[in-house]
Amino acid sequence: MSIKSQEGHMRQLALLLTSDLGCIFGERESGPNGSKKAFLNVGKVFLRALAKDLGLHEVTVSANSGGIAVSGTCSLYGMWEDRGIAVWIEQRLCADGKVLCYRPIRSSRDFKGGYNHFLTSSDLKTWSYPQLLETLSALRKDGCRYERAA
């Protein structure tokens, strides 16, 4: 996927994640005007292309819609040669603006991983796609040690 289309997905995700995706209106679990469903679909497309651009293998991309009061989560688990990365995109319950979480992992079955790192919806709005790739690729470099969170 092109840099321009991935930047478009970043902007679209930032916009969706600044609106209320959790909708407590009975049968309308897709949020107002289907925004929750749009978030989950765009999130999966974005993460699949991100995995390819990061050069990951053993990739798992998934979406969990959650319940009616939450945004749902899009996730990516992928491996380089000796280490990997886990990425989640979600609307957190506390309104701190953190929408993308990433951390190093040792295997595709490592659900504890290292320390969490966060990006905000503002970062997704303003950063270029190459800047995002560079930030996430830093976990691949030898200088980034894997440490288990307490």
Task: Locate the predicted segments by residue.
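Charged, low-complexity intrinsically disordered regions
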Residues: 40, 47, 133-147
